[in-house]
Amino acid sequence: VRAVKRRLIVDGEITEFLQNRSTAAELGVKNNGSARSVDFNREPIIRMSNTFVEPGDHTVEELIKEVRHGIYFKSFTEWNIDDKRLNQRYVGLEAYRIENGQLGTLVKAPVLEITTPALWGSVRARGKTVAFESATCGKGDPMQGIPVWTGGPDTLLGGVRIGSR
């Protein structure tokens, strides 16, 4: 099955789910080639491929200028999401306080804990520049780890609470 570009969320609404031949037939939708395996002798599993947030129209500086009081997560030391893909947690590695549109002092290990609907519902703007990093999509028993790319632009979230470790 030929892989195709998938737009899972558009304007905050889920528009598509990952499918293989079996699930697509069962649900009466088109197969979008989302099953892969680590080797010929393993069952193909529905899994993410290269996944990213599409760019927007803003520079990083423009995004920061929009913030009255907040935190800029420049990089992350950890992130995780539960098996239901509902609750997620992000811990900043390099992060800065933002006051009145200006970057300030470093912040030690800020934490964003949020649900998936709240995360996507809080997006206010996206940056122009997209950065990617390598990752692994791990699934199955026995475990199958497949290389993928993740990433996206700097993204402005509004109305979220940031804690600390």
Residue ranges and their predicted role:
Residues 1-165:
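N-terminal small-residue-enriched
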